[in-house]
């Protein structure tokens, strides 16, 4: 195999890896968004619930880390 052919194969491999990496990154964006939304909801619930003693007592798994 000549040098041009080897270089062409190298470029094709790099292109294929880039395409696969790019598409898999975009596929995970939906999962990341869902996880971020869940974390935001838990933080909002914690901020509202933990200062309230009855709510804090009924949700120890949410509030115990700060006490």
From Swiss-Prot:
| GO MF, one annotated term | acetylcholine receptor inhibitor activity
Entry coiled-coil feature ranges: none
| UniProt main location, coarse | secreted
Pfam families named in the record: Toxin_8
Range of residues in the leader sequence? 1-21
Keyword field contains Secreted: yes
Question: What GO cellular component is one of the record's annotations?
Answer: extracellular region
The disulfides recorded in the entry are: 49-55, 50-63
Q: Which UniProt keywords apply?
A: Acetylcholine receptor inhibiting toxin, Disulfide bond, Ion channel impairing toxin, Neurotoxin, Postsynaptic neurotoxin, Secreted, Signal, Toxin
Region entry Lacks the Ser-Xaa-Pro motif that is crucial for potent interaction with nAChR, spans: 51-53
Among its keywords, does the record have Signal? yes
On tissue specificity, the annotation reads:
Expressed by the venom duct.
InterPro entries cross-referenced by the UniProt entry: Conotoxin_a-typ (IPR009958)
**Propeptide span(s):** 22-46
Compartment list: Secreted
The domain section of the record reads:
The cysteine framework is I (CC-C-C). Alpha4/7 pattern.
Q: Which family does it belong to?
A: Belongs to the conotoxin A superfamily.
What job does the chain carry out? Alpha-conotoxins act on postsynaptic membranes, they bind to the nicotinic acetylcholine receptors (nAChR) and thus inhibit them. Has possibly a distinct nAChR binding mode from other alpha-conotoxins, due to a different three residue motif (lacks the Ser-Xaa-Pro motif).
Protein name as annotated: Alpha-conotoxin-like Qc1.1a
